[in-house]
Amino acid sequence: MAEMWISMGPQHPMTHGLWTLKVKIDGETVVDTEPDLGYIHRGVEKICEARDFTQITTYCDRLCYASANTWSHAYIYAAEDLLEVEVPERAEYIRMIAVELQRIASHLMWLGAYCPDVGNLTGLVWCLRERELMMDLLQELGGSRMHYNFPRVGGVKRDLPIGFAMRCKAKLKLFLDRIQEYEALLDESTIFLVRTQGVGYAKAEEMINHGVSGPNVRAAGHNYDVRWAHPYSVYDELDWEPSVERPSIKGSDCYDRYRVRVEEMRQSALMILDGLDKMPGGADTHYQSGDPAIIGKAPARAAEGQTGFHHFEDSRGESMFYLAGGGEERGKHPYRVSCLLYTSDAADEGLGVDLG
Protein backbone atom coordinates (compact mmCIF):
# COMPACT_ATOMS: atom_id res chain seq x y z
CA MET A 1 0.00 0.00 0.00
CA ALA A 2 1.30 3.46 -0.89
CA GLU A 3 2.21 5.81 1.92
CA MET A 4 -0.05 8.81 2.46
CA TRP A 5 -0.34 11.87 4.72
CA ILE A 6 -3.49 12.54 6.75
CA SER A 7 -4.29 15.46 9.03
CA MET A 8 -5.37 14.87 12.62
CA GLY A 9 -6.43 18.30 13.71
CA PRO A 10 -6.38 20.93 14.73
CA GLN A 11 -6.89 18.85 17.84
CA HIS A 12 -5.42 17.43 21.00
CA PRO A 13 -5.02 13.63 21.01
CA MET A 14 -8.08 13.36 23.26
CA THR A 15 -10.01 16.62 22.85
CA HIS A 16 -9.91 19.41 20.28
CA GLY A 17 -8.39 22.67 19.13
CA LEU A 18 -4.91 22.66 20.66
CA TRP A 19 -2.61 21.52 17.87
CA THR A 20 -2.44 19.95 14.43
CA LEU A 21 -0.75 16.61 13.86
CA LYS A 22 0.04 15.52 10.33
CA VAL A 23 0.56 11.78 10.16
CA LYS A 24 2.25 9.75 7.43
CA ILE A 25 0.88 6.22 7.36
CA ASP A 26 1.61 2.96 5.58
CA GLY A 27 -1.54 0.93 6.08
CA GLU A 28 -2.07 1.01 9.86
CA THR A 29 1.56 1.87 10.63
CA VAL A 30 2.56 5.47 11.40
CA VAL A 31 5.91 6.13 9.72
CA ASP A 32 6.27 9.89 10.27
CA THR A 33 4.57 12.82 12.01
CA GLU A 34 4.66 16.62 11.83
CA PRO A 35 3.23 18.39 14.95
CA ASP A 36 2.19 22.04 14.72
CA LEU A 37 1.71 23.66 18.15
CA GLY A 38 0.60 26.99 19.56
CA TYR A 39 -3.09 27.21 18.69
CA ILE A 40 -4.14 28.50 22.11
CA HIS A 41 -1.18 30.59 23.19
CA ARG A 42 -2.74 33.04 25.66
CA GLY A 43 0.18 35.03 27.03
CA VAL A 44 -0.43 33.84 30.59
CA GLU A 45 3.06 34.77 31.79
CA LYS A 46 2.62 38.40 30.71
CA ILE A 47 -0.86 38.58 32.24
CA CYS A 48 0.53 37.36 35.58
CA GLU A 49 3.07 40.18 35.68
CA ALA A 50 0.13 42.60 36.07
CA ARG A 51 -1.38 40.65 38.99
CA ASP A 52 -0.30 40.35 42.61
CA PHE A 53 1.02 37.10 44.02
CA THR A 54 -2.39 35.97 45.32
CA GLN A 55 -4.32 36.67 42.11
CA ILE A 56 -1.96 34.64 39.92
CA THR A 57 -3.23 31.37 41.41
CA THR A 58 -6.51 31.77 39.53
CA TYR A 59 -4.72 31.81 36.18
CA CYS A 60 -2.60 28.78 37.05
CA ASP A 61 -5.74 26.69 37.58
CA ARG A 62 -6.52 27.24 33.91
CA LEU A 63 -3.18 26.14 32.49
CA CYS A 64 -4.45 22.56 32.28
CA TYR A 65 -8.06 21.75 33.05
CA ALA A 66 -7.26 18.06 33.63
CA SER A 67 -4.65 18.87 36.28
CA ALA A 68 -5.62 22.26 37.68
CA ASN A 69 -4.48 21.64 41.25
CA THR A 70 -1.01 20.68 40.09
CA TRP A 71 -0.27 23.97 38.36
CA SER A 72 -1.67 26.22 41.06
CA HIS A 73 0.36 24.35 43.68
CA ALA A 74 3.52 24.50 41.56
CA TYR A 75 3.16 28.28 41.35
CA ILE A 76 2.41 28.66 45.06
CA TYR A 77 5.60 26.85 46.04
CA ALA A 78 7.65 29.17 43.82
CA ALA A 79 5.88 32.22 45.30
CA GLU A 80 6.57 31.00 48.83
CA ASP A 81 10.22 30.50 47.93
CA LEU A 82 10.35 34.07 46.59
CA LEU A 83 8.52 35.59 49.57
CA GLU A 84 10.20 33.34 52.17
CA VAL A 85 6.92 32.14 53.64
CA GLU A 86 6.73 29.15 56.01
CA VAL A 87 3.77 26.78 55.68
CA PRO A 88 2.18 24.82 58.58
CA GLU A 89 2.65 21.05 58.44
CA ARG A 90 -1.10 20.38 58.35
CA ALA A 91 -1.45 22.63 55.31
CA GLU A 92 1.29 20.64 53.55
CA TYR A 93 -0.57 17.39 54.16
CA ILE A 94 -3.78 18.90 52.82
CA ARG A 95 -1.91 20.09 49.73
CA MET A 96 -0.47 16.63 49.15
CA ILE A 97 -3.93 15.08 49.39
CA ALA A 98 -5.37 17.59 46.89
CA VAL A 99 -2.54 17.08 44.40
CA GLU A 100 -2.63 13.27 44.56
CA LEU A 101 -6.41 13.23 44.13
CA GLN A 102 -5.85 15.38 41.06
CA ARG A 103 -3.17 12.97 39.79
CA ILE A 104 -5.59 10.06 40.04
CA ALA A 105 -8.32 12.03 38.24
CA SER A 106 -5.87 13.04 35.50
CA HIS A 107 -4.60 9.48 34.98
CA LEU A 108 -8.19 8.23 34.86
CA MET A 109 -8.93 10.72 32.10
CA TRP A 110 -5.80 9.56 30.26
CA LEU A 111 -6.74 5.90 30.54
CA GLY A 112 -10.39 6.58 29.78
CA ALA A 113 -9.45 8.37 26.54
CA TYR A 114 -6.88 5.70 25.67
CA CYS A 115 -9.20 2.70 25.96
CA PRO A 116 -11.61 3.50 23.08
CA ASP A 117 -8.62 4.38 20.87
CA VAL A 118 -7.52 0.75 21.16
CA GLY A 119 -11.01 -0.71 20.88
CA ASN A 120 -12.22 -0.89 24.50
CA LEU A 121 -15.17 1.40 25.12
CA THR A 122 -15.94 -0.20 28.48
CA GLY A 123 -12.66 1.15 29.85
CA LEU A 124 -13.80 4.71 29.11
CA VAL A 125 -17.06 4.26 31.01
CA TRP A 126 -15.37 2.64 34.00
CA CYS A 127 -12.64 5.27 34.25
CA LEU A 128 -15.12 8.15 34.12
CA ARG A 129 -17.17 6.39 36.80
CA GLU A 130 -14.23 6.37 39.23
CA ARG A 131 -13.09 9.82 38.17
CA GLU A 132 -16.37 11.14 39.59
CA LEU A 133 -15.31 9.86 43.01
CA MET A 134 -12.14 11.94 42.82
CA MET A 135 -13.98 14.98 41.45
CA ASP A 136 -16.45 14.83 44.34
CA LEU A 137 -13.59 14.88 46.85
CA LEU A 138 -11.83 17.72 45.04
CA GLN A 139 -15.07 19.68 44.96
CA GLU A 140 -15.35 19.27 48.73
CA LEU A 141 -11.91 20.82 49.12
CA GLY A 142 -12.06 23.64 46.60
CA GLY A 143 -15.77 24.23 46.05
CA SER A 144 -15.54 23.64 42.30
CA ARG A 145 -15.28 20.65 39.99
CA MET A 146 -12.53 22.03 37.79
CA HIS A 147 -10.89 25.34 38.75
CA TYR A 148 -10.36 24.96 42.47
CA ASN A 149 -8.28 28.02 43.40
CA PHE A 150 -7.40 25.99 46.48
CA PRO A 151 -3.78 26.71 47.51
CA ARG A 152 -2.85 30.02 49.09
CA VAL A 153 0.48 31.66 49.80
CA GLY A 154 1.14 30.30 53.28
CA GLY A 155 -1.36 27.44 53.23
CA VAL A 156 -4.68 26.45 51.68
CA LYS A 157 -8.08 28.10 51.25
CA ARG A 158 -9.82 26.11 53.97
CA ASP A 159 -9.29 23.20 56.32
CA LEU A 160 -10.60 19.72 55.53
CA PRO A 161 -14.42 19.61 55.77
CA ILE A 162 -15.93 17.72 58.70
CA GLY A 163 -15.99 14.01 57.90
CA PHE A 164 -13.77 14.41 54.82
CA ALA A 165 -11.14 11.94 56.02
CA MET A 166 -13.74 9.21 56.52
CA ARG A 167 -15.37 9.79 53.13
CA CYS A 168 -12.01 10.00 51.39
CA LYS A 169 -10.79 6.72 52.88
CA ALA A 170 -14.00 4.93 51.89
CA LYS A 171 -13.83 6.13 48.28
CA LEU A 172 -10.13 5.36 47.93
CA LYS A 173 -10.56 1.84 49.26
CA LEU A 174 -13.35 1.32 46.73
CA PHE A 175 -11.10 2.75 44.03
CA LEU A 176 -8.26 0.35 44.90
CA ASP A 177 -10.68 -2.53 44.30
CA ARG A 178 -11.78 -1.00 41.00
CA ILE A 179 -8.16 -0.79 39.79
CA GLN A 180 -8.08 -4.58 39.91
CA GLU A 181 -11.14 -4.58 37.64
CA TYR A 182 -9.30 -2.36 35.14
CA GLU A 183 -6.38 -4.77 35.12
CA ALA A 184 -8.67 -7.76 34.59
CA LEU A 185 -10.48 -5.94 31.78
CA LEU A 186 -7.38 -4.80 29.89
CA ASP A 187 -4.58 -7.21 30.75
CA GLU A 188 -6.74 -10.17 29.75
CA SER A 189 -7.95 -8.57 26.50
CA THR A 190 -6.19 -9.99 23.45
CA ILE A 191 -7.17 -6.97 21.35
CA PHE A 192 -5.78 -4.53 23.93
CA LEU A 193 -2.51 -6.45 24.24
CA VAL A 194 -2.02 -6.75 20.48
CA ARG A 195 -2.54 -3.02 20.04
CA THR A 196 -0.24 -1.94 22.89
CA GLN A 197 2.56 -4.49 23.26
CA GLY A 198 5.45 -4.01 20.86
CA VAL A 199 4.04 -0.67 19.66
CA GLY A 200 5.89 2.65 19.99
CA TYR A 201 9.20 1.44 21.41
CA ALA A 202 11.32 4.12 23.08
CA LYS A 203 14.39 3.68 25.28
CA ALA A 204 15.06 5.72 28.40
CA GLU A 205 18.11 7.34 26.80
CA GLU A 206 16.04 8.56 23.85
CA MET A 207 13.41 10.01 26.18
CA ILE A 208 15.97 11.79 28.34
CA ASN A 209 17.63 13.28 25.25
CA HIS A 210 14.24 14.65 24.17
CA GLY A 211 13.50 16.05 27.64
CA VAL A 212 10.68 13.60 28.37
CA SER A 213 9.83 13.21 32.06
CA GLY A 214 7.04 11.84 34.21
CA PRO A 215 5.26 8.50 33.68
CA ASN A 216 6.61 8.05 30.16
CA VAL A 217 10.27 8.08 31.18
CA ARG A 218 9.53 5.91 34.23
CA ALA A 219 7.81 3.44 31.92
CA ALA A 220 11.16 3.17 30.13
CA GLY A 221 12.89 2.19 33.38
CA HIS A 222 14.38 5.56 34.40
CA ASN A 223 13.81 6.06 38.12
CA TYR A 224 13.22 9.82 38.21
CA ASP A 225 10.34 11.44 40.07
CA VAL A 226 10.64 15.01 41.39
CA ARG A 227 8.75 14.03 44.55
CA TRP A 228 11.44 11.40 45.24
CA ALA A 229 14.60 12.99 43.82
CA HIS A 230 13.95 16.48 45.24
CA PRO A 231 11.31 16.02 47.98
CA TYR A 232 8.97 18.90 48.69
CA SER A 233 5.84 19.23 50.82
CA VAL A 234 5.55 16.06 52.97
CA TYR A 235 6.55 13.45 50.39
CA ASP A 236 9.67 12.54 52.36
CA GLU A 237 7.45 11.64 55.33
CA LEU A 238 5.31 9.15 53.39
CA ASP A 239 5.95 5.47 52.76
CA TRP A 240 6.34 5.21 48.98
CA GLU A 241 8.72 4.75 46.05
CA PRO A 242 8.40 5.82 42.39
CA SER A 243 6.55 3.42 40.09
CA VAL A 244 9.05 2.25 37.48
CA GLU A 245 8.51 -0.37 34.78
CA ARG A 246 11.14 -2.85 33.56
CA PRO A 247 10.87 -2.67 29.76
CA SER A 248 12.37 -5.05 27.22
CA ILE A 249 15.78 -4.50 25.64
CA LYS A 250 14.03 -2.65 22.79
CA GLY A 251 12.67 -0.07 25.23
CA SER A 252 9.25 0.73 26.63
CA ASP A 253 6.11 0.27 24.55
CA CYS A 254 2.54 1.54 24.85
CA TYR A 255 1.71 -1.27 27.27
CA ASP A 256 4.49 -0.19 29.65
CA ARG A 257 3.19 3.38 29.58
CA TYR A 258 -0.27 2.12 30.46
CA ARG A 259 1.07 -0.06 33.28
CA VAL A 260 3.07 2.70 34.96
CA ARG A 261 0.01 4.96 35.14
CA VAL A 262 -2.11 2.22 36.66
CA GLU A 263 0.57 1.67 39.31
CA GLU A 264 0.79 5.42 39.95
CA MET A 265 -2.95 5.62 40.57
CA ARG A 266 -2.67 2.81 43.10
CA GLN A 267 0.36 4.49 44.64
CA SER A 268 -1.35 7.90 44.92
CA ALA A 269 -4.35 6.34 46.68
CA LEU A 270 -2.06 4.66 49.22
CA MET A 271 -0.12 7.91 49.73
CA ILE A 272 -3.34 9.78 50.53
CA LEU A 273 -4.43 7.10 52.99
CA ASP A 274 -1.00 7.28 54.63
CA GLY A 275 -1.17 11.08 54.76
CA LEU A 276 -4.62 11.09 56.36
CA ASP A 277 -3.28 8.89 59.15
CA LYS A 278 -0.11 10.95 59.69
CA MET A 279 -1.63 14.42 59.38
CA PRO A 280 -1.30 16.45 62.59
CA GLY A 281 -4.57 17.56 64.17
CA GLY A 282 -5.88 19.35 67.22
CA ALA A 283 -6.40 22.93 68.31
CA ASP A 284 -2.74 23.86 67.86
CA THR A 285 -2.59 22.92 64.16
CA HIS A 286 -3.28 25.36 61.34
CA TYR A 287 -4.02 25.26 57.62
CA GLN A 288 -2.63 28.75 56.92
CA SER A 289 0.45 30.69 57.88
CA GLY A 290 0.15 32.65 61.10
CA ASP A 291 1.98 35.61 59.57
CA PRO A 292 -0.40 38.62 59.71
CA ALA A 293 1.24 40.00 56.56
CA ILE A 294 0.00 36.95 54.61
CA ILE A 295 -3.49 36.07 55.85
CA GLY A 296 -6.37 37.51 53.84
CA LYS A 297 -4.29 39.94 51.80
CA ALA A 298 -1.77 40.15 49.01
CA PRO A 299 1.70 39.23 50.32
CA ALA A 300 4.28 41.94 50.76
CA ARG A 301 6.40 42.97 47.79
CA ALA A 302 9.51 41.00 46.88
CA ALA A 303 12.84 42.78 46.75
CA GLU A 304 14.34 43.59 43.37
CA GLY A 305 16.65 40.81 42.28
CA GLN A 306 15.04 38.30 44.64
CA THR A 307 13.91 35.11 42.89
CA GLY A 308 11.81 32.05 43.61
CA PHE A 309 11.88 28.68 41.86
CA HIS A 310 10.12 25.37 42.22
CA HIS A 311 9.83 22.25 40.12
CA PHE A 312 6.88 19.95 40.61
CA GLU A 313 5.81 16.44 39.58
CA ASP A 314 2.73 16.91 37.42
CA SER A 315 0.68 13.93 36.25
CA ARG A 316 2.35 14.30 32.82
CA GLY A 317 5.88 15.12 33.92
CA GLU A 318 8.08 17.75 35.50
CA SER A 319 6.76 21.32 35.66
CA MET A 320 8.64 24.43 36.79
CA PHE A 321 7.90 27.99 37.90
CA TYR A 322 10.39 30.84 38.12
CA LEU A 323 9.47 34.19 39.70
CA ALA A 324 11.48 37.39 40.01
CA GLY A 325 10.67 40.24 42.39
CA GLY A 326 10.54 43.83 41.18
CA GLY A 327 11.04 45.79 44.39
CA GLU A 328 9.38 49.20 44.93
CA GLU A 329 8.80 49.81 41.23
CA ARG A 330 6.64 46.71 40.78
CA GLY A 331 5.00 46.79 44.22
CA LYS A 332 3.21 43.53 44.98
CA HIS A 333 3.44 42.37 41.37
CA PRO A 334 6.24 40.05 40.22
CA TYR A 335 8.77 41.45 37.76
CA ARG A 336 8.86 38.19 35.81
CA VAL A 337 6.83 34.98 35.75
CA SER A 338 8.14 32.03 33.78
CA CYS A 339 6.25 28.76 33.76
CA LEU A 340 7.55 25.74 31.88
CA LEU A 341 4.11 24.24 31.71
CA TYR A 342 3.99 22.18 28.56
CA THR A 343 7.59 20.99 28.57
CA SER A 344 6.67 17.36 29.16
CA ASP A 345 3.92 17.30 26.52
CA ALA A 346 6.04 19.08 23.91
CA ALA A 347 8.92 16.69 24.61
CA ASP A 348 6.60 13.71 24.19
CA GLU A 349 5.44 15.09 20.85
CA GLY A 350 9.02 15.60 19.71
CA LEU A 351 9.81 12.03 20.64
CA GLY A 352 6.74 10.93 18.70
CA VAL A 353 8.25 12.46 15.56
CA ASP A 354 11.36 10.31 15.98
CA LEU A 355 9.34 7.20 16.79
CA GLY A 356 7.35 7.77 13.63
Specify the residue positions occupied by each region the protein language model found.
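Intrinsically disordered terminal and processing segments
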Residues: 1-5, 90, 97-112, 250, ...
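Structured beta-strand/loop patches that form or line metal/cofactor-binding pockets in enzymes
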Residues: 2-26, 37-40, 226, 232-235, ...
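N-terminal cap/recognition module
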Residues: 29-72
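Internal, well-ordered alpha/beta segment that forms a basic, Gly-enriched binding/recognition surface
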Residues: 64, 69-184
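Intrinsically disordered, low-complexity regulatory segments
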Residues: 123, 127, 137-299
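Conserved small/polar residues in nucleotide/adenosyl-binding loops
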Residues: 342-349
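Hydrophobic alpha-helical segments, chiefly the membrane-spanning helices
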Residues: 353-355
